[in-house]
Each structure stands twice: as structure tokens, then as C-alpha cells.
């Protein structure tokens, strides 16, 4: 769905390590950099089929020893939005994609990631731009969709997280609303 730009088609600044060590990745491999200081980066550029609102998703493997504060930047029609993502959390869409937000784009879209992290590996795999027409249209632009939650489901970003009450770990910094609904 939409346009996918893999790491092999992205622009790199500085050396990155190609890897297939972790199983969940898009394409033949992903790129990784350890304990970066922000001097290396990767930029995904996409020519979109038409202007409009797109959901931007990042692919990363998730797991131990990955950055808890990967710094993504999405450049869109209204400027740019910076997003911190906990890459140690499992991606929420098919175990491969993590939604970064919905943004209005002209015909060109750009995603950026620097290797500055918290002494752990930063993963750069693929970025997906999916037209909102192909998805649920409820989410507002440039902000997480905090839809009504169902029974014991925590919502953050756009996809429900099925974590227990004792171990909830939000993969993106921000404000969350929790609602509990009792059923008999």
C-alpha cells in the first residue's frame, strides 16, 4: 500500500552497517549504527502519486539493544515534524511497521533519521507513505490518533497495544489517554 522507500534506495551520510541479523525487516537487509552521536544520517525521499494526506510508517526490527530515542524527522507541506521513537518496542503494524503520523504532502515526501541514540543501536530500514484514503480517515493531521479504547486496550499512535496493565511501555513519547470499560 502506498510508496515504500527501502534503505538500499535512501541517501546515506556517513557509514552504516548492513545487517540481516534481526528477522523482521523490509527488503534484503537493514542499516544499523551503534552508539551514534548524530553525525551519520539516512534520508528517504519519495515521489508521491498525488498531493494529499499520507500516513508515514517506519520499519525497524524492534528488540533488545536498540535505541529508545531514535530521532526521525518528517518533512511535509507544513514544515517538519520531529518524532522520538523507542526502537526497542516491537513495531505495531504486522510486526514490521510503526506509524510516525499523518501528514499533508505535496508531490514529494521526505523522512530523515540520524544515528544519535542512547548508547544503543539505531536501525534504518524502510519508510512507507500510505494515502489516508486507503486507511481509516479518523486521525487528525500531524498528531497521534487517540481513538476511543476498547476493553483493556491501550491506544497510542494509531494501533492498539495489547500490553497488560503491569507492563505498559509506550513506544513514542507523548500524552496518552487511558480508558477502561467494564463488561459483564
Where are the language model's segments positioned?
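Low-complexity, glycine/serine/threonine/alanine-rich intrinsically disordered linker
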Residues: 1-28, 40, 63-65, 76, ...
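A surface-exposed beta-strand-loop module
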Residues: 34-47
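Preference for bulky hydrophobic residues occupying beta-strand positions
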Residues: 44-46, 58, 72-74, 180
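Hydrophobic loop/turn residues within beta-sheet-rich immunoglobulin-like superfamily modules
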Residues: 47-49, 103
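A short tyrosine-centered beta-strand micro-motif
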Residues: 52-58, 176
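Beta-strand acidic-aromatic groove motif in beta-rich domains, primarily in extracellular
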Residues: 55, 65-73
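Substrate-binding/catalytic groove segments of enzymes
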Residues: 65-66, 80-82
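Solvent-exposed serine/threonine-rich low-complexity stretches and specific carbohydrate-binding patches
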Residues: 82-91
Amino acid at each position: 500500500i502506498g510508496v515504500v522507500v527501502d534503505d538500499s534506495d535512501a541517501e546515506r551520510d556517513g557509514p552504516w552497517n548492513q545487517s540481516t541479523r534481526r528477522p523482521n525487516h523490509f527488503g534484503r537487509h537493514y542499516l544499523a549504527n551503534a552508539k551514534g552521536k548524530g553525525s551519520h544520517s539516512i534520508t528517504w525521499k519519495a515521489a508521491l502519486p498525488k498531493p494529499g494526506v499520507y500516513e508515514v510508517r517506519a520499519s525497524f526490527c524492534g528488540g533488545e539493544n536498540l535505541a529508545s530515542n531514535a530521532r526521525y524527522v518528517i518533512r511535509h507541506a507544513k514544515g517538519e515534524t520531529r518524532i522520538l521513537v523507542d526502537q526497542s518496542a516491537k513495531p505495531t503494524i504486522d510486526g514490521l511497521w510503526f506509524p510516525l503520523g499523518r501528514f499533508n504532502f505535496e508531490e514529494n515526501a521526505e523522512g530523515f533519521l540520524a544515528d544519535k541514540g542512547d548508547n544503543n543501536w539505531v536501525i534504518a530500514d524502510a519508510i512507507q507513505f500510505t494515502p489516508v484514503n486507503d486507511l481509516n480517515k479518523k486521525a487528525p493531521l500531524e498528531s497521534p490518533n487517540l481513538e476511543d479504547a476498547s476493553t483493556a486496550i491501550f491506544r497510542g499512535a494509531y494501533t492498539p497495544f495489547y500490553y497488560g496493565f503491569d507492563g505498559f511501555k509506550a513506544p513514542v513519547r507523548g500524552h496518552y489517554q487511558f480508558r477502561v470499560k467494564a463488561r459483564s
